């Protein structure tokens, strides 16, 4: 459906080092802007689940990267201050009717860049959502949360205060970080480098997970990398070295819960009863 658009972007990306705001041709500029608009509206997304597997559409990520090559910095008005950046703000032209129509609540001074999709019944406290991100319905993005470029946030997710969800642009990553539906990410936790937190998982406060973080399941003894299995309750911890001379940080799966249990038991209770 978007093959021609993809072809233009793929071709332009191969010569991206030579592209500047001054010399970007009309075809490339229009293709990139169209791709960003499709991301902004949610019509397309950088990653989606197909037949149970997450698939990254690399050409859309390339469109995001190209947008930084073709656009110059410009003055951006924002409340009582001004900004100077290449990417305009998503809500710059919204009026009350459009906010009502799209069903999004935005508390000042939450910032969302154009090219990020924010679904209905989402609440944005003072937070930051970067270009290419996808935030699905019913999600709470709490105070001082950062949702990185192209990150994928599922339905009914709670991102607690100060949570960091890593992006793909800086440093450049192959795949976006993904938080699936009905997950809870505790305050000040960080999930980065394309890690996938699968559906219904609960991450405690202050847990840091990257591709190199060992995710230890204490019930089975398994160690996972880059993926938190569905329904996991995860806390921070340590694992001893082979010679016992020291221990190193890890994330520990202390239990598994299903949707029925989550529905009956509060998040705090799940995290308190881990012994």
Curated annotation (Swiss-Prot):
An individual GO BP term: diaminopimelate biosynthetic process
Record's GO cellular component terms: cytoplasm
Enzyme Commission numbers on file: 2.3.1.117
Keyword Repeat: yes
Pathway info: Amino-acid biosynthesis; L-lysine biosynthesis via DAP pathway; LL-2,6-diaminopimelate from (S)-tetrahydrodipicolinate (succinylase route): step 1/3
Residue positions binding substrate: 105, 142
Subunit structure: Homotrimer.
PANTHER family xrefs: 2,3,4,5-TETRAHYDROPYRIDINE-2,6-DICARBOXYLATE N-SUCCINYLTRANSFERASE (PTHR19136:SF52), MOLYBDENUM COFACTOR GUANYLYLTRANSFERASE (PTHR19136)
Family statement drawn from the similarity comment of this UniProt entry: Belongs to the transferase hexapeptide repeat family.
Protein name in UniProt: 2,3,4,5-tetrahydropyridine-2,6-dicarboxylate N-succinyltransferase
Annotated source species: Pectobacterium atrosepticum (strain SCRI 1043 / ATCC BAA-672) (Erwinia carotovora subsp. atroseptica)
């Amino acid at each position: 459906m978007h093959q021609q658009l993809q072809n233009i972007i793929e071709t332009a990306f191969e010569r991206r080092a030579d592209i500047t705001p001054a010399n970007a041709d009309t075809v490339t500029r229009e293709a990139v802007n169209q791709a960003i608009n499709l991301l902004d509206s949610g019509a397309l997304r950088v990653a989606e689940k197909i037949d149970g597997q997450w698939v990254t559409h690399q050409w859309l990520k390339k469109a995001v990267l190209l947008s930084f090559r073709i656009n110059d910095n410009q003055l951006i008005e924002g409340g009582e201050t001004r900004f100077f950046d290449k990417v305009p703000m998503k809500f710059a032209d919204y009026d009350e009717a459009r906010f009502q129509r799209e069903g999004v609540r935005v508390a000042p001074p939450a910032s969302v860049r154009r090219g990020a999709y924010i679904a209905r019944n989402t609440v944005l406290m003072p937070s930051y959502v970067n270009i290419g991100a996808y935030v699905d319905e019913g999600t709470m993005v709490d105070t001082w949360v950062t949702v990185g470029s192209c990150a994928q946030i599922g339905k009914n997710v709670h991102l607690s205060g100060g949570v960091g969800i890593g992006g793909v642009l800086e440093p450049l990553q192959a795949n976006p970080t993904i938080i699936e539906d009905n997950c809870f990410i505790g305050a000040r936790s960080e999930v980065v480098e394309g890690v996938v937190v699968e559906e219904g998982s609960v991450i405690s406060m202050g847990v840091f997970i990257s591709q190199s973080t060992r995710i230890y399941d204490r019930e089975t003894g398994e160690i996972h990398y880059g993926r938190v299995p569905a329904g996991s309750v995860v806390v921070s911890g340590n694992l001893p070295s082979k010679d016992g001379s020291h221990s190193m940080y890890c994330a520990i799966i202390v239990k598994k819960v299903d949707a029925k249990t989550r529905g009956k038991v509060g998040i705090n209770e799940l995290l308190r009863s881990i012994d």
